[in-house]
């Protein structure tokens, strides 16, 4: 299938492309995000428990679900928000909400991603909600990931942007140093994420929804076996979770200049 995603699919011949729309070359990135989000909501059925994602793409899916509820095209939906930001959006739109304690099995989660590699491994959580996202999306029967084509990479960390790691505040610089050392061969630079004050200066460490800090890993080269890397990160005392979502996505929806492409992990 002719799409901008094709050059990256060398490692994913098992994936099935199930749909492609006409070219969208004149649309903005924000419009592409909205198109991908609306396509994902086509997977939602009445009576489902839905994981509501976080971020600039997922917000369009949340808004679309609300719209369909108001129109009566969806009924009896329960949303499980992945962040306080999404919780606030869903409440404002009148979507009924719950949590994993009350609904431990989620029928479908819809969320964006910061990076997607050819095997549908993801980087998520650059917005700081990675722990809640991973808990809810890990409890989901299906996990639909929605991106525009700018998020497609050849390897995790390949965009040059951060792979986030949530850490406890206690001795966070010690943890930061250990993480940097772990991936030194990949040219890793680990930085504690800081909030920017009103004067444009770094004011204080950025805090997650769970009152933890974030260490951002910037990688110059591929870190190799992702499962090995994941286990190594999580072995460090002080690490809460990382933003690599490995083998979790069941469907990828990509909106790009060649149209909308849906790829299913299991064909």
Swiss-Prot record:
GO BP term, example: pentose-phosphate shunt, non-oxidative branch
Pathway: Carbohydrate degradation; pentose phosphate pathway; D-ribose 5-phosphate from D-ribulose 5-phosphate (non-oxidative stage): step 1/1
Disruption phenotype: No visible phenotype under normal growth conditions (permissive temperature of 21 degrees Celsius), but mutant plants have a temperature-sensitive phenotype (when transferred to 31 degrees Celsius) showing radially swollen roots and reduction in cellulose production.
Name of the top EC class for this enzyme: isomerase
Protein name listed in UniProt: Probable ribose-5-phosphate isomerase 1
Organism for this UniProt entry: Arabidopsis thaliana (Mouse-ear cress)
InterPro entries hit by this protein: NagB/RpiA_transferase-like, Ribose-5P_isomerase, Ribose5P_isomerase_typA_subgr, Ribose5P_isomerase_type_A
Keyword Phosphoprotein set for record: yes
Gene Ontology terms, MF aspect: ribose-5-phosphate isomerase activity
Tissue: Expressed in roots, cotyledons, leaves and flowers.
Keywords, sorted A to Z: Acetylation, Cytoplasm, Isomerase, Phosphoprotein
EC number: 5.3.1.6
Superkingdom field: Eukaryota
Pfam families the record matches: Rib_5-P_isom_A (PF06026)
Source species taxonomy: Eukaryota, Viridiplantae, Streptophyta, Embryophyta, Tracheophyta
Catalytic activity, as annotated: aldehydo-D-ribose 5-phosphate = D-ribulose 5-phosphate
GO CC annotation, single: cytoplasm
Similarity comment text for this entry: Belongs to the ribose 5-phosphate isomerase family.
Functional description taken from the UniProt entry: Catalyzes the reversible conversion of ribose-5-phosphate to ribulose 5-phosphate.
Modified sites of kind Phosphoserine: 92
Gene this protein is translated from: RPI1
Modified residues (N-acetylglycine): 2
């Amino acid at each position: 299938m002719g799409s901008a995603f094709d050059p990256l699919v060398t490692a994913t011949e098992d994936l099935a492309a199930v749909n492609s729309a006409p070219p969208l070359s004149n649309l903005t990135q924000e419009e592409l995000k909205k198109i991908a989000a609306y396509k994902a909501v086509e997977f939602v059925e009445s009576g489902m428990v839905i994981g509501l994602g976080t971020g600039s793409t997922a917000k369009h899916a949340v808004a679309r679900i609300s719209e369909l509820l108001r129109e009566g095209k969806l009924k009896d939906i329960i949303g499980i928000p992945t962040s306080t930001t999404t919780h606030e959006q869903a409440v404002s739109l009148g979507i009924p909400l719950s949590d994993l304690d009350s609904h431990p099995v989620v029928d479908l989660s819809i969320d964006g991603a910061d990076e997607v590699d050819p095997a549908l491994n993801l980087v998520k959580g650059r917005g700081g909600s990675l722990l809640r996202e991973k808990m809810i999306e890990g409890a989901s029967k299906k996990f639909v990931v929605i991106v525009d084509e700018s998020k497609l990479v050849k390897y995790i960390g390949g965009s040059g942007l951060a792979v986030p790691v949530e850490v406890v505040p206690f001795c966070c610089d010690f943890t930061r140093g250990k993480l940097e050392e772990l991936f030194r061969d990949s040219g890793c630079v680990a930085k504690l994420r800081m909030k920017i004050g009103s004067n444009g200066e770094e004011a204080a460490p950025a805090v997650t929804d769970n009152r933890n800090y974030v260490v951002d890993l910037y990688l110059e080269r591929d870190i190799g076996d992702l499962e090995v890397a994941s286990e190594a990160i999580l072995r460090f005392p002080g690490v809460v979770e990382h933003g690599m979502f490995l083998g979790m996505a069941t469907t990828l929806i990509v909106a790009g200049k060649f149209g909308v492409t849906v790829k299913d992990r299991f064909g």
